[in-house]
Amino acid sequence: CVPTPLSKVGDPDISYIITAIDVINKGIHKDLLIVLESTTYPGTTQEIVFAHLEKSRLTVGKDYYLCFSPERIDPGNKKYTVANTPKVIGGITAACTQLGALLYEQIVDEVVTVSSPETAEMVKLLENTYRSINIGLVNEVAIMCEKLGVDVWEVIDAAATKPYGFMKFTPGPGLGGHCIPIDPQYLSWKMR
């Protein structure tokens, strides 16, 4: 997992990923499992990482294994730890996915395999975009409630009693975490 910031103009800066892959390429050998966990746009594992590793002349899924598995840690959260947070993984080939899942099964309670690295990359962007939108929404609702003289906390607590279709978010400063505000930018950039 390496940093994946945005450039000064708001484009994904994947230079850290490329540097890491260049280092791996110098020592790549048979039976190596490589898993990218850095948040990035769909296609990075296939179009960038795999493309750089092809220079090794080894065969993916046979000689070495390449997967994407989004980092899903919530620092400081005692309820959801590395062990009990399901791990999503998608490999370049079925053999890659299988070996990656085998590794993570030693660490986490549940591994969720998906059909491709692009799917796994998109999972992380959906999760964080969903969070970003809903935090923004609840902050707007808090402003409206204040203007209306309504207790936003009472509204949220009452809405949270609905057993489906509502997930509780609470208002506060900012979005929380460095990645939440920038992750939707990756998706926006890729779709251009």
Located regions from the model:
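Structural/interface elements that position substrates and couple domains in central-metabolism enzymes
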Residues: 1-192
